[in-house]
């Protein structure tokens, strides 16, 4: 009986070790400045985003040059298909930070198509952030029942890669580490 118990304990320890070894590294990849969407007077918060998808509070940082573009609310159409939601890109209207309509480049249009293909909830707000004129990010607010998930994605290789998620926040800036 003791041997069986010892073998089970050893097996459980090996599984736990395997789980921790296979876990994504907690390497910091970038800083973000965020502000609560619900409160006008709320202070902004700075967080470090890690490769594992986690984010933690950090000190103030120097942001990189970020240009924000916001998709028109009618660019994405959401419908229910069988047991899940399907997003369809119906237009590619983008606005700059002043509210002027801008012509999206090929990468921005590809990002919008990737969002429609990859995201399985109704897209409430879609922002494209071009950092230093080279790297593309998307900040997507979804229409989900009891909360407003806001997810930061990096666009690379034709796909959106999820970096981190918050509840009901606005992205103000990004700074590379």
Indicate where each model-derived feature is located.
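Hydrophobic membrane-insertion alpha-helices, especially the h-region
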Residues: 7-19
């Amino acid at each position: 009986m003791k041997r069986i118990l010892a073998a089970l304990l050893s097996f459980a320890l090996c599984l736990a070790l395997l789980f921790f070894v296979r876990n994504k590294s907690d390497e910091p990849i970038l800083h973000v400045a965020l502000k609560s969407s619900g409160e006008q007077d709320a202070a902004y918060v700075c967080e470090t985003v890690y490769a594992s998808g986690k984010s933690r509070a950090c000190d103030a940082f120097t942001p990189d040059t970020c240009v924000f573009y916001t998709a028109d609310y009618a660019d994405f159409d959401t419908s229910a298909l069988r047991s899940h939601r399907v997003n369809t890109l119906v237009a590619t209207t983008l606005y700059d930070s002043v509210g002027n309509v801008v012509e999206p480049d090929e990468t921005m249009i590809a990002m919008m198509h990737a969002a429609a293909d990859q995201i399985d909830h109704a897209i409430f707000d879609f922002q494209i952030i071009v950092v230093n004129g080279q790297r593309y990010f998307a900040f997507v607010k979804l229409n989900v029942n009891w909360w407003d998930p806001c997810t930061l994605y990096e666009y690379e290789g034709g796909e959106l890669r999820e970096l981190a998620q918050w509840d009901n926040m606005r992205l103000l800036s990004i700074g590379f580490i």
